[in-house]
């Protein structure tokens, strides 16, 4: 589970000198995800949609008033109200490319590097020291990021996620229907719908296998 991998390792890094209650917040394109830690021990994970975030944060700190430190990773513009509310209850660090990170980088445009990718590479650097690591994360987009054994972030690639692939087939053609992912996928589709499912899911599977093989 990418979020938990990020949350555990990034909390261990940024909050390693304190044994208090810590909070990580992962702000995605559709959901807010929260992980509460007692020191480095995961206590609970929670989640909510964007429109519920202010109410959710208030309830979270009612349940865990001991939280003293918070780190936020956001791939979208974070509402100032949410940051202000978090700061009312804890010391907040918003992750960015200028944060003190456990790796060096050769990325040519670090200011454009998503904090979701930064967080996962930071987690990989801590979890797998002195090893070449390929980090794959699937969400709205599928990202591939490479960390070398000498702890240097080289870069990676960004590809459309599952929902984006379904939507693009529908949006850029005249007659293909808009579908949602399904659990049962045949390699060879015997109808337009099953052919779309096969193209999207098998395409992603083969893409991931190919990227792993390439690296």
What residue ranges belong to the model's regions?
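Glycine-rich phosphate-binding loop plus the immediately following alpha-helix
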Residues: 115, 120-130, 154-198
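Glycine/small-residue-rich loop that forms an oxyanion/phosphate-binding "nest" at active or ligand-binding sites
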Residues: 90-124
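Hydrophobic alpha-helical signal peptides and transmembrane signal-/tail-anchor segments
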Residues: 1-9
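Conserved active-site and cofactor/substrate-binding residues in soluble primary-metabolism enzymes
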Residues: 48, 52, 112-119, 164, ...
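Adenine-nucleotide phosphate-binding core of ATP-dependent small-molecule kinases
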Residues: 46, 185-215
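Gly/Thr-rich phosphate-binding beta-strand-loop-beta motif of the actin/hexokinase/Hsp70
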Residues: 21-38, 131-153, 169
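N-terminal glycine/serine-rich phosphate-binding loop of ATP-dependent small-molecule kinases
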Residues: 11-101
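Acidic-glycine-rich active-site phosphate/pyrophosphate-binding loop
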Residues: 91-102, 140, 177-184
């Amino acid at each position: 589970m990418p979020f938990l991998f990020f949350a555990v390792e990034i909390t261990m890094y940024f909050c390693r000198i304190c044994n208090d209650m810590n909070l990580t917040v992962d702000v995605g394109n559709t959901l807010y995800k929260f992980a509460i830690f007692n020191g480095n021990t995961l206590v609970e994970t929670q989640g909510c949609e964007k429109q519920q975030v202010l109410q959710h944060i208030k309830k979270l700190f009612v349940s865990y008033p001991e939280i003293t430190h918070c780190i936020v990773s956001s791939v979208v513009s974070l509402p100032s109200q949410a940051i202000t509310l978090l700061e009312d209850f804890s010391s907040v660090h918003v992750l960015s490319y200028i944060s003190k990170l456990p790796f060096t980088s050769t990325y040519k445009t670090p200011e454009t590097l998503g904090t979701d990718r930064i967080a996962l590479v930071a987690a990989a650097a801590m979890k797998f020291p002195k090893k070449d690591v390929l980090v794959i994360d699937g969400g709205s987009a599928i990202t591939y990021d490479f960390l070398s054994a000498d702890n240097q972030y080289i870069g990676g690639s960004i590809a459309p996620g599952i929902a984006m692939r379904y939507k693009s087939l529908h949006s850029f053609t005249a007659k293909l229907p808009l579908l949602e992912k399904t659990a049962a996928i045949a390699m060879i589709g015997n109808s337009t719908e099953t052919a779309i499912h096969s193209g999207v899911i098998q395409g992603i599977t083969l893409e991931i296998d190919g990227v792993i093989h390439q690296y």
